[in-house]
């Protein structure tokens, strides 16, 4: 019998939400206003200093950077080295993330540990265009996705074979489906499984 995930979920097997703070660069003037958003300026300074560039005391004027929150779902049984999608959302006053690249961003679980690292070019579904007399915004240009944009660095241990019992939670609970699944499990238990 193959497990049909459209019928039931195995209790305890689930995705885990991850979150991180990062910078998107290459925004062609649509990023954060550094005078209004101090955390973007501080993050940019800290990142450049880690790379050996000292800009303390210098006046930074760039609209090409935005502070962002990065979120993703670590899949159940996600293994180290595999990739997952992430969503990138502007945190400051950036107008548009189109054309931006997310710099290396650690993604943390609720326990504070790093489980994945994200980086890459954003795909934006929204857009913004403006002229002298009008401005048009469609969708949400301050939110984007990076398909396969994070690499899983740490796995969440879940030893299904060490559980004393495995519980199934039916997606659409009804007596007939429950009875059929119970019969299939009991039949499997009687057979020699290799």
Question: What are the language-model segments listed below?
Answer:
Residues 1-2:
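Short, small-residue-biased leader/transition segments that mark boundaries at the very start
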């Amino acid at each position: 019998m193959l497990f049909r995930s459209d019928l039931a979920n195995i209790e305890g097997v689930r995705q885990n939400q991850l979150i991180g703070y990062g910078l998107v660069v290459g925004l062609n003037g649509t990023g954060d206003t550094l005078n209004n958003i101090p955390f973007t300026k501080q993050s940019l300074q800290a990142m450049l200093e880690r790379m050996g560039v000292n800009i303390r005391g210098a006046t930074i004027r760039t609209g090409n950077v935005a502070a962002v929150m990065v979120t993703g779902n670590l899949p159940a049984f996600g293994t180290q080295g595999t990739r997952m999608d992430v969503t990138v959302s502007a945190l400051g006053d950036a107008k548009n993330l189109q054309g931006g690249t997310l710099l290396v961003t650690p993604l943390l679980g609720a326990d504070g540990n790093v489980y994945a690292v994200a980086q890459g070019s954003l795909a934006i579904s929204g857009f913004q265009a403006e002229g002298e007399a009008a401005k048009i915004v469609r969708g949400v240009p301050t939110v984007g996705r990076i398909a396969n944009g994070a690499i899983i660095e740490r796995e969440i241990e879940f030893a299904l074979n060490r559980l004393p019992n495995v519980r199934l939670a039916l997606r659409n609970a009804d007596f007939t489906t429950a009875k059929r699944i119970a019969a299939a499990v009991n039949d499997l238990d009687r057979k020699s499984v290799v």
